[in-house]
Amino acid sequence: RLGPPSLRRAASNGPLGDAAADRALPVATDGDPSKETALDSDHWTFWGRGQRPPERGSKNAWASEPLHKIRTAEAFFRLHGALEKPSTLGNGATYQLFRNDVEPTWEDPSNANGGEWSIPLERSADLDDQWKRLCLAAIGGQLTPSADDADLDEVCGCSLSLKKGGALRLGVWTKHRTDEASQRAVAENIRRVLSLQKEVALTYAPHDSKGDALYTS
C-alpha cells in the first residue's frame, strides 16, 4: 500500500518534488480511459504528506508531494484502494486531492483569494468512507455551488489532516471567499454528501485569516 511513512517511495515510478513538473506524474489507470467515467475536470492530482518526523527541519522539507493524476472515476477507486487508509495514518499525515494543476498551497493563484470549509470529525471507523465520499463528490462536481459554467471550478480541492492528540479535520478549498452565496451552497453540498448531523458545525476561513471564521454553517 502507498502511504506514510513511505509516501515518497510509494510513487517512485514517477517523479516527485517540484509540482511544476506535475505533467510527468504517473497516471493512475489500468483500464481504457475511453470506456471509463470522465471527471468534471481534465484531471485531479492526489497529494500526500507522511507523519511529521521527530527532528525539526524546514517547512518545505515536510511539504505535500504530488503522487498521481487521476482522469476517471475508476482510476480514483484503483488509487484509493492502493493507498493507506486514513484511519491507519499517524499524526501529522495529510492527504489532498486537487483539481488539475492547482497546488495545495495558499499561494497558488486559484487559492489566493479563497478559503477552506473545515469539517470536524471523530477518528472513527467511518473516517475512511467519509474521505472517499468527499473525494468522489469533488471529482464528480457534486460540491460545486451550481451547474453554471462559472461555478464549475469553484471547488479547488479537498484535504484530510490528522493532528496531534488524535484530532481530525476534513477540508474543502474554494476559490472565491467573498461570494457568500456560493460558499454556503458548497457547505450545504458537503453536509448532503457526508450525511452530517445539524450539530456538526462547519466553519469557513480565508487562507490568510489565521483561522478566523468568515462563515459558519
Language model region names:
Residues 71-74, 126:
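A generic structural signal for alpha-helix starts
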Residues 1-2, 119:
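Intrinsic structural disorder
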Residues 74-86:
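Short active-site loop/helix that positions an aromatic residue
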Residues 48-50:
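Residue-level signal for short segments within beta-strands and strand-turn junctions
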Residues 8-16, 25-36, 41-43, 52-62, ...:
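Conserved NAD+-utilizing ADP-ribose enzyme module
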Residues 64-69:
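A short, exposed loop/beta-hairpin motif centered on an aromatic-Gly-Thr core
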